[in-house]
A protein has these predicted regions:
Chain A
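Transmembrane helix boundary and interhelical loop/hinge segments in multi-pass membrane proteins
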Residues: 13, 62-80
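Short helix-to-coil transition segments within interhelical loops
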Residues: 80-88
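Junction motif at the cytosolic side of a transmembrane helix
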Residues: 200-216
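Transmembrane helix segments
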Residues: 145-191, 195-197
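A structural motif at transmembrane helix-loop-helix junctions in multipass membrane proteins
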Residues: 121, 130-162, 215-216
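Aromatic- and glycine-rich beta-strand/loop motifs that create alpha-glucan
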Residues: 1-23
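Long, hydrophobic alpha-helical segments
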Residues: 49-66
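Selective transmembrane-helix segments that form parts of the transport pathway or gating/packing helices
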Residues: 87-114
């Protein structure tokens, strides 16, 4: 594993401030619009807000990974890596960097919002953990979708990848209900972690296969 | 000898010749068989005690929902064959399955909705089976649009096959996860699984219609794959000589 690639990728994304601050701000705007459209002081169950948060993080991580490969594809950087046989590492590090700079900040913004709803600190921290884990899964799959739909627009990528993410959404929804009922979450959480490990170790290979096919 | 047979059969040219000879008779045979099954089911079986005559749509709904999933699995097998052995024919076949699968899945959803109105009192219920079928339908549409969006069809075949393989892993997962989700939210009164065992008088025409429908759909797949071969290999000399 070449550590330099990680630093380069980190630097490249960090320099493009709009690419990682932008999604977080968009997410903040979406979150601000919840209290405007739903009466936050009424007795709506907290689950409603949590499910809104799952769905909006799904969409915002999609926005955040929209340009994950296209710039490097256009200027030939990916081809260089492919020649050096480092494509898998690049894909892996790109996903990691996007998770650190977009996925985790989104999770913390959502955590602040959940705290503001007077939901107990235990449930909020579990939700934070779930968001951090599930954002990695989302980013992996959306990178796959964006690798497939390079130069074709992101609607195609969304259309293809959201069906794959539905099980994750269902597990998240099930977790929130059990958390609010006070049931144990160890089973769901370990399932989510397992899915994360599987996805994060398997999808980069698929993505590098797809990118190699693009470069042929 | 077997190897030689496979090599011959796997070339689009000889497949086309064989399909040209047998495709249409097979399709016609299963079409008539399916019509026969429908006639048997619609006119020669007694009405259901609870559902009356409305249950008779079972002879269209059950084969369609069955095929909706089988076609995806078949598509995954042909895609795997394409990715592993680089057989172009397999890619053509799996590409031509996708639209048929989408139509069959839509038909399953549609007939289910029609059946739901008299029996459940609603045309849609967010339960496990219906939701997973709807996701399946959207997956078919996504695959079709993915294949259509690439000018370079060889690339499109590869992406399509990779995605089908990820999708087929996902199908049981979706089914299972939707099951968990619905067991929490919904009483079991309206699930199809808890229906009492079906009477032989209705079971035999049902089996008959399922078999006939499988044959009918595979006949259609053969015809549609022939079409795809002609489209993709139109610059080859053997196609020009037809």
């Amino acid at each position: 594993m070449d550590r330099d690639i990680l630093y380069i990728e980190m630097y490249k994304l960090f320099k493009r401030r709009r690419a990682w601050i932008g999604p977080v701000l968009v997410f903040l705007l979406i979150i601000i619009s919840f209290p405007l459209t739903l009466d936050i002081n009424s007795d709506n169950p907290p689950q409603i807000y949590l499910s809104f948060i799952w769905i909006s993080t799904l969409l915002v991580t999609m926005l955040g990974t929209e340009l994950i490969f296209s710039d490097d594809f256009e200027d030939g950087t990916l081809e260089q890596y492919a020649v050096n046989d480092q494509l898998i590492e690049v894909v892996f590090y790109k996903i990691l960097v996007h998770w650190v700079l977009i996925g985790i900040p989104l999770a913390f913004v959502a955590f602040l919002f959940i705290l503001s709803l007077n939901i107990s600190i235990q449930i909020s921290s579990i939700a934070l953990l779930c968001l951090i884990i599930s954002n990695l899964i989302f980013i992996n799959f959306f990178s796959l979708g964006n690798a497939l739909s390079l130069k074709k627009g992101s609607i195609l990528g969304l259309l293809i990848t959201i069906p794959f993410l539905i099980p994750v959404l269902i597990v998240l929804g099930k977790m929130t209900t059990s958390a609010l009922l006070g049931l144990s979450l160890v089973g769901h959480l370990s399932l989510l972690v397992g899915v994360m490990i599987l996805v994060a170790s398997f999808i980069p290979f698929v993505i590098s296969f797809i990118l190699r096919t693009h470069l042929e | 000898m077997i190897k030689k047979f496979f090599h011959q059969f796997a070339s689009p040219k000889s497949y086309f010749a064989i399909a040209n000879k047998f495709g249409k008779p097979v399709l016609a045979f299963f079409f008539l068989l399916y019509i026969g099954a429908l006639v048997w089911g619609l006119f020669f079986t007694p009405p259901d005690v609870v559902q009356g005559d409305s249950y008779r749509i079972i002879y269209m709904h059950v084969p369609a929902s069955f095929m909706a999933q089988i076609l995806f699995v078949v598509m995954a097998i042909t895609s795997a064959v394409f990715l592993i052995w680089k057989l172009k024919l397999a890619a053509y076949v799996s590409k031509s399955i996708a639209p048929i699968g989408a139509i069959v899945t839509f038909f399953a959803l549609f007939s289910g909705s029609i059946w739901g109105i008299p029996t459940w009192g609603t045309w849609w219920q967010w339960d496990a089976r219906i939701t997973s079928t709807l996701i399946l339908f959207i997956m078919y549409l996504g695959l079709i649009s993915l294949h259509a969006s690439f000018e370079n069809k060889d690339k499109a075949d590869k992406f399509f096959s990779v995605l089908v393989l990820i999708g087929v892993v996902n199908i049981p997962v979706i089914k299972k996860s939707v099951d968990w989700w619905s067991t929490l939210h919904q009483s079991a009164s309206i699930t199809l699984t808890s229906k009492p065992a079906i009477d032989p008088v209705m079971l035999y025409p049902l089996m008959f219609s399922i078999v006939a429908f499988i044959g009918l759909i595979f006949g259609l797949v053969i015809l549609s794959s022939q079409n795809e071969i002609l489209k993709r290999e139109k610059y080859k000399s053997w196609v020009k000589n037809i």
